[in-house]
Amino acid sequence: LHKPIRRKDFNMKNFKRFTALFLAMLMLFSLAACGNSTTSDKGTEEATTSAFDVMSQFNEIGVSYPLTVTDQAGRTVTFEKAPEKIASSYYISTSLLLALGLQDKLVGIEAKANTRNIYKLAAPAIVSLPNMGTAKEFNTEACVAAAPDVVFLPIKLKKTADTLESLGIKAVVVNPEDQSLLEECITLVGKITNNVGRAEALNNSIKTFLADNKTNVSGENTPSVYLAGNSSVLSTAGSKMYQNTLLTNAGGKNVASELTDTYWANVSYEQILAWNPDYIVIAADATYSADDILNDANLAGCNAVKNKNVVKLPNDIEAWDSPVPGSFLGSIYIASVLHPEKVTKDFYETCVTKFYESFYGFTPAK
């Protein structure tokens, strides 16, 4: 998948139609993947059909205001009405806002927006919006000037959220660092922005695939996987990071799950060799390649290198090793590497296409 072959005007009709198509593909895949077992066929068919029946119905659910919510930092925020002007200083929440169809309400987004392909593909106009800064240095002046009704911030900017509240700007902290927290984040943002029905459809789409994928790879071997970080092959994600969920959802085992760091952890070559993973998966935005690892003499004794089981996550659209709504597609991709007999490349590409057509309004190219 590389560039969009065409853009679509996103509307409710397209949303319902593409969501139904996306879910139908999930249903067909589940039935085909389990074709070797009659009992498995029946159970998977019933589960998938039930989910399809629910998810193909998109309900417009209104929110009553005033609305009081608790954000993912435990802060209480009250809204008198649905926000009309929205800012985001976190690419995770910005991508989510696009998935909820709120690009026209954005008045400011995080720094380096022009480096994110998803923005150029789904909503090119937002790239030129005022810069709200980074997770390390928030641009309070620009935010005040943009006068948003709400600004979404990462957990690292919790103190900034309190500062903004003192300036009269509603601030909501999000922290989607595992599958349940991502679901909670989608629900929270959907409720605040009066998009509950679409948020539910998004969550249901994600949950349906993950449930089906669990069925499809159950009973298979569980390969050990080392996830190499963006900065270096010697950085990785432990059990407290979303990337751990990415691997387990793909039917793999994170060799670094013993680590409890809440950010990328630095490890040694010796530690990687001791873990001796079956596969090495490189983060999407890494500045090095699979060939760099395959040619690294320090890793010559690693099973993943010996067997040439080293891959890099796609980054044509967005980094699926981050907790964006489409991150479950990263699990599909990894599953297609770990379990190619159960998760085909064609299915992976179809899921990517249907998901972005349904929730972001563009068709990726193959």
What residue spans do the PLM features occupy?
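Extracytoplasmic substrate-binding proteins
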Residues: 76-78, 159-235, 256-258, 309-366
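Short helix-initiation/N-cap motifs at beta->coil->alpha
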Residues: 72-74, 129-141, 260-269
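Alpha-helical, coiled-coil/dimerization segments enriched in small aliphatic residues
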Residues: 236-264
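Bacterial Sec-exported substrate-binding components of ABC uptake systems
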Residues: 10, 17-18, 23, 33-95, ...
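A short, structured surface patch at a secondary-structure boundary
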Residues: 88-146, 150-152, 156, 255
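Proline-aspartate-enriched helix->loop->beta-strand connector
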Residues: 132, 140-153, 169, 268-284
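Short, Lys/Arg-enriched N-terminal segments with co-localized hydrophobic residues
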Residues: 1-11
